[in-house]
């Protein structure tokens, strides 16, 4: 059976030297449920990355953001799908977001990222962005 390809975008949002990290809900496969990620989501057919990222953060966090430059991209193969994860430099006018689709959120410095249990794709992307 051929694996499904997913195009996913994520936001790198900083407040000074700290970056926003979000924890996934307790749903989906064990290898991603409750793991940490950079906020974002899937790109729908007919959307560009910028539209998808703004839509996802509005739907999942009731938060309006500005999507800036592309920072990097990785491809990762999970047991039942392949994800292409692309990060964008984003800005928010405030920190007034809601956790509508996440368990938790925190602001960490890159050297603190190892404290969290990241999805494999996000861990690979973080390694690339903060090498």
Outline where the language-model segments fall.
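Conserved N-terminal beta-strand and adjoining loop/helix that marks the start
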Residues: 1-20, 42
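A generic structural micro-feature
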Residues: 2-5, 32-35, 79-84, 99
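Short secondary-structure boundary/capping segments
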Residues: 3, 11-12, 27-29, 75, ...
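Active-site-adjacent beta-strand/loop module that shapes the phosphate/pyrophosphate-binding cleft
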Residues: 15, 64-66, 74-96, 106
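Conserved Nudix-box catalytic region and its N-terminal flanking loop in Nudix hydrolases
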Residues: 18-59
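NUDIX/MutT-family hydrolases
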Residues: 89, 98-129
């Amino acid at each position: 059976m051929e694996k499904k390809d997913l195009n996913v975008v994520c936001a790198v949002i900083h407040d000074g030297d700290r970056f926003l990290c979000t924890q996934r809900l307790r749903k989906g496969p064990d290898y991603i449920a409750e793991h940490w990620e950079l906020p974002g989501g899937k790109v729908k057919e007919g959307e560009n990355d910028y539209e998808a990222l703004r839509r996802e953060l509005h739907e999942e966090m009731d938060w309006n953001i500005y999507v800036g430059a592309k920072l990097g991209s990785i491809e990762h193969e999970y047991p039942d799908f392949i994800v292409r994860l692309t990060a964008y430099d984003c800005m928010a006018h405030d920190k007034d977001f809601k956790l509508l689709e996440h368990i938790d959120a925190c602001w960490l410095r890159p050297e603190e990222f190892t404290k969290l249990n990241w999805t494999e794709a996000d861990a690979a992307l973080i390694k690339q962005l903060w090498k």
